[in-house]
Amino acid sequence: MKNQEESGWQAFLTLCSKMQKEKFLQDLFSLFLSFGERKDVASRYHIIRALLEGELTQREIAEKYGVSIAQITRGSNALKGSDPQFKEFLQKEI
């Protein structure tokens, strides 16, 4: 089953990379992700951006975006495990 999940995820990423119009990408995510899942992705985006900016405490991030400290900790741990070049890319793009 894990192999199927990995190949499905890779196929999804490949499909995302082929989207040349933002509208198509929005339609794709609306097709594959529920409203709640899209909301979770948006929250994770805000958390990662705030952590990269480094201007707010975790408590301030939680209050500003209406997320839990646990969600922020998960985002922080994911960032800690990220490739330094990838984090540099994110800091420029986010």
Curated annotation (Swiss-Prot):
Name this protein carries in UniProt: Trp operon repressor homolog
Primary role: This protein is an aporepressor. When complexed with L-tryptophan it binds the operator region of the trp operon and prevents the initiation of transcription.
Quaternary structure (record): Homodimer.
Gene Ontology cellular-component terms listed: cytoplasm
Ligase keyword on record: no
Similarity remark: Belongs to the TrpR family.
Keywords in alphabetical order: Cytoplasm, DNA-binding, Repressor, Transcription, Transcription regulation
Native source species: Chlamydia trachomatis serovar L2 (strain ATCC VR-902B / DSM 19102 / 434/Bu)
Highest taxon, organism lineage: Bacteria
Gene3D superfamilies: TrpR-like
Pfam families: Trp_repressor (PF01371)
DNA-binding region: 58-81
Subcellular location field: Cytoplasm
GO biological process, one term: negative regulation of DNA-templated transcription
An example Gene Ontology molecular-function term: DNA-binding transcription factor activity
SUPFAM superfamilies cross-referenced by the UniProt entry: TrpR-like
Signal peptide: none
Record gene name: trpR
Database matches in InterPro entries: Trp_repress, Trp_repress_bac, Trp_repressor/repl_initiator, TrpR-like_sf
